[in-house]
Amino acid sequence: MSKPRQSTLDPEDKKYLEIPDSEVVLPAAVDSYLRQKLKDQSLKECSSHVAAFADCSKDKYISVVWECRELQQLMKNCLVEYTTSERLIGMKREWVDASKKRIYEKRLQKELESKEPTPKK
């Protein structure tokens, strides 16, 4: 197993944020993952509302429409509150910033390696 990579970056160093966003590509798989993560977080935050609606609708078919309407609306309002585009944008921003940090660390590492003297034979 490989060891976890040690960061060569000072935790206070925020120069990596100077890397333009255009150098970081958000792959479709990451976008999909972040959307799923947002959905999972929202369901966790609204678990009491989701459970209440699920309990109400257990033994009902068509009557669920009018018998569980209030619980469904509470669940929907909660999910809408937590599943916002602002939260998704924030998650994407965190991912982009983490990518910038990795890019910056790689550049620093290359600079350090290029400055090291080569051993003479």
UniProtKB/Swiss-Prot annotation:
| GO CC term, one of those recorded | mitochondrion
Cysteine-cysteine disulfides: C46-C78, C56-C68
Tell me which domain of life the UniProt entry assigns to the organism this sequence originates from: Eukaryota
The question of whether Disulfide bond is a record keyword is answered with yes
Q: Which Pfam families match?
A: Cmc1 (PF08583)
| Motif Cx9C motif 1: positions | 46-56
Alphabetical keyword list: Disulfide bond
Q: Where is the CHCH domain?
A: 43-86
Motif Cx9C motif 2, chain ranges: 68-78
Member of which family? Belongs to the CMC family.
Q: What is this protein called?
A: Uncharacterized protein DDB_G0275933
